[in-house]
Amino acid sequence: MSQVFDASAFLATCSGRPGVYRMFDGEARLLYVGKAKNLKKRLASYFRKAGLAPKTAALVARIAQVETTITANETEALLLEQNLIKEWRPPYNILLRDDKSYPYVFLSDGEFPRLGIHRGAKKAKGRYFGPYPSAGAIRESLSLLQKAFSVRQCEDSYYANRTRPCLQYQIKRCKGPCTDLVTAEEYAEDVRHSVMFLEGRSQQLGNELNAEMEKAAMALDFEKAAELRDQIALLRRVQDQQYIEGGSGDVDVIAAFVNPGGACVHLISVRGGRVLGSKNFFPQVGIEEEVAEVMAAFLSQYYLGNAERELPGELIVNVVHEDFNAITEALHTLRGRELTISHRVRGTRARWQQLAVTNAEQALNARLANRQHMAARFEALAEVLGLDEVPQRLECYDISHSSGEATVASCVVFGPEGPIKSDYRRFNIEGVTAGDDYAAMHQALTRRYGRIKDGEGKLPDVLLVDGGKGQLNMARDVMQALGFTDLTLLGVAKGVTRKAGFETLYLNDVHHEFTLKGDSSALHLIQQIRDEAHRFAITGHRARRGKARRVSSLEDVAGVGPKRRRDLLKHFGGLQELNRASIDEIAKAPGISKKLAESIYASLHSE
């Protein structure tokens, strides 16, 4: 029997001071965390008899217990609230996805440093630039720097073992420091120019390159002048695309947009007056929230939730909230940095504010349109299969291998809102006859649904199997053996022409065979899920096959176990470079004797 919460008795003893409150259900599960200037006043608003929004009313109906923590002030309440949300991720709070792995551009130490993408803790010695809002934005910057200044981007292990320049040198994306084709002084100058660009000093960099170009032309060094001209032209194109007219400094432009279907926050990162990129966030909104509440929750979680995130000097937002002062004070307490949150802006800053709003609105509408389209396809599938209810979870399996080598089975999961990628799974198939797809599917399904039988994971409403009659029969046998006799099974076989739109479908057994018209929404959903399972299987298979082939030629060498194989490949930067190495070069690798080097060389070069 569920516990009934006595709101009147609770409010009679509730403090009116600032603090944090936690709402629990009858099974002691945390439902919601909130903060308030006045705990009693804020909590009383939940228990009034009328005027609550439907989702808020649903939350209140589940409350069995409320706990409070009094704090010295609002700032302390905000910090405690964010810590609790981050730790427990309550279902009715506005939640951002964990984003600890935002990428940086990393410039290593050393005489010939490398540029690359870095995620995670900053342990390696060197300089870090960013964070960038997306991997796409950082790759764009690295590509530009490689074209303009040819600073190497290869891993140190690869660089250290080169005996001749690689393809990047041939296409003029690197100056070949690995084989002494560039002096340390010239390379250092290219690194300095790259740093100026990453620091946002492109105007100063352009002026410097112009002066150098004129100097080279005066000295009749036309080849050098042409190289500098190309660098300047590249920089100007970037400035036209990325720079805010009249803008400078470090700013994040943030807009929140909310409608009944969800919420979107769009963030544009500007550093040194240069737009690094932008990103959409779709926070989970558990109860009806105003756009200002979404903005306040985003700022708190995004900037307070990650101590390593670099703070700009200013945030430009499209709404105001009473918590903004507490947020800036909390950031000052935690990070020792002053930060301004601006709402009323003019000129270029106002145009960028409006651009962020437009992007947030369009992104949310596109997401909801896709979600509605997907939901309509699910309804069509339910009708075609004669189901009493619209399925909420579909799983599809596929097998991929190369003549039986490195067999991988994939499982993809879809719901009415689209793919549920966190539930995707791959299975490395072992112990079956090479090329036996039925045995491979049997193993994958047995492993997957055996775990579900043991209480791990969720059972789908419909199980799709790519492969037709044989695979469907095998899937049915596995499900019956595990006791899942009520599960809807759907086999998908390619038609005679093997073209999309001509598939033959089998429902539950091979005797219930049917086809759908090419324009059927249900068929389009089936094709989408099948193709995604195929893609996911092929990706896994290629990765497994590549890994196996990298080490297979070393596996039969006595004295070279898994650890030594890994160390060898790491030392040479890959199997290709190891293949090119001489016996003497192999013997220089850590832990490799001359005799063992001879055995390795013989194995690699045997017919």
From Swiss-Prot:
UVR domain ranges (all copies): 203-238
Ranges where the GIY-YIG domain occurs: 16-94
SMART domains with a match to the protein in the record: GIYc, HhH1
SUPFAM superfamilies linked to this entry: C-terminal UvrC-binding domain of UvrB, GIY-YIG endonuclease, RuvA domain 2-like
Family matches, as InterPro entries: GIY-YIG_endonuc, GIY-YIG_endonuc_sf, GIY-YIG_UvrC_Cho, Hlx-hairpin-Hlx_DNA-bd_motif, RuvA_2-like, UVR_dom, UVR_dom_sf, UvrABC_protein_C
GO biological process: nucleotide-excision repair; SOS response
Predominant location category: cytoplasm
Keywords, in A-Z order: Cytoplasm, DNA damage, DNA excision, DNA repair, Excision nuclease, SOS response
Localization, UniProt: Cytoplasm
UniProt keyword Signal present: no
Gene3D superfamilies: 5' to 3' exonuclease, C-terminal subdomain, GIY-YIG endonuclease, UVR domain, UvrC, RNAse H endonuclease domain
Any one GO CC term of the record: excinuclease repair complex
Pfam families membership: GIY-YIG (PF01541), HHH_5 (PF14520), UVR (PF02151), UvrC_RNaseH (PF22920), UvrC_RNaseH_dom (PF08459)
Role summary: The UvrABC repair system catalyzes the recognition and processing of DNA lesions. UvrC both incises the 5' and 3' sides of the lesion. The N-terminal half is responsible for the 3' incision and the C-terminal half is responsible for the 5' incision.
Family: Belongs to the UvrC family.
Assembly: Interacts with UvrB in an incision complex.
Annotated protein name in UniProt: UvrABC system protein C
Originating species: Pseudomonas putida (strain ATCC 700007 / DSM 6899 / JCM 31910 / BCRC 17059 / LMG 24140 / F1)
Gene: uvrC
